[in-house]
Amino acid sequence: MRIVLFGAPGVGKGTFAEILSKKENLKHINVGNILRNEIKKESNIGKEVQNVVRSGNLVSDSLIINIVHDEMKNILNKKYKGFILDGFPRNMYQSKELIKMTNIDLFVNIYLPRNILIKKLLGRRICNICDKNFNVSNIQQDSFDMPPILPSKDCIQCNGHTNLIKRKDDNEDIINHRLNSYESDYIPIIQFFKNEKYNLIDFPLRRGIRDFDDFYSILVNYRKNEKLK
C-alpha cells in the first residue's frame, strides 16, 4: 500500500501517519523529520537546511526528491507492506517526479481552517528525548474539540518525563509565511491529482487524533472497492 498524505503544517498528518504506519506495517517517510535529523547531526545537508528553515522558506526540490528516492529504495530491503509519504510532494514539479518514481494507491488531503491551524502550530512541541511531536494547545471552538497531545508514560524512551521544546520556526510571522507558501503550492497540486482522476480523498478534521477511526475507514473502504474491481 502506497499512500500520500497532504495537509498544511500543523494539521496533524504526521501523527496520523505514525499511527497508521504501525497499524499496517507501512514505512512512514516523514520528510520534515528527516531534515531535522540532518540538522541535529550537523551534516552538510543539515547546515544547508537550517539556513533555509531560519528564513521561513522551503528546501530545494532536488534535495527533497533525492531524500525521498533514497528512502523508497531502502524500503525494498525491509519487510514493510508499503509506505506513507508525509511532507512530499510539495509542489507541481515534485508531484510529477513522484509519478515517475512510483505508483501511488491513495492520496488523502487532511485539512483544517487556517485560524485553527495557527492555534495548533503555536502549541506544537517536540520531545527532547524521543523526538516525537506533541501539542500543548487546547482548542475548544465552534465544532472543533481538540485537547492537548502530551507525552505518555508508556513511551519506552522518555517515559513521559521530558522537556518539550518549541521549534524555532513556530512563531506567528513564520507560521503565516509557511501557510501562505503551502496554500500557493498545494491548491494546484490537489486539483491536479483530482483532475487526473487519482484516488484523492478530502478528510476534514474536527476532533484531532480522535478522528483517526474515520480516517482509517478510508483505507478500509479503498481495499473493499479494489477487491470488487
Curated annotation (Swiss-Prot):
InterPro entries: Adenyl_kin_sub, Adenylat/UMP-CMP_kin, Adenylat_kinase_CS, P-loop_NTPase. Transmembrane segments: none annotated. The keyword Nucleotide-binding applies. Its main location: mitochondrion. Keywords: Iron, Kinase, Mitochondrion, Nucleotide-binding, Transferase, Transit peptide. Pfam families: ADK. One of its GO terms (cellular component) is mitochondrial matrix. A ribonucleoside 5'-triphosphate binds at G10, V11, G12, K13, G14, T15. It catalyses: a ribonucleoside 5'-triphosphate + AMP = a ribonucleoside 5'-diphosphate + ADP; GTP + AMP = GDP + ADP. It is found in: Mitochondrion. AMP binds at R36, N57, L58, V59, G87, F88, P89, R90, Q94, R178. Residues 123-170 are annotated as: LID. Coiled coil: none annotated. Inhibited by the dinucleoside pentaphosphate compound P1,P5-di(guanosine-5') pentaphosphate (GP5A). It comes from the Eukaryota. Belongs to the adenylate kinase family. There is a putative zinc finger domain which may bind to iron. Catalyzes the reversible transfer of the terminal phosphate group between GTP and AMP. Has very low activity with UTP, ITP, CTP and IMP and no activity with ATP, GMP, CMP and UMP in vitro. This is GTP:AMP phosphotransferase.
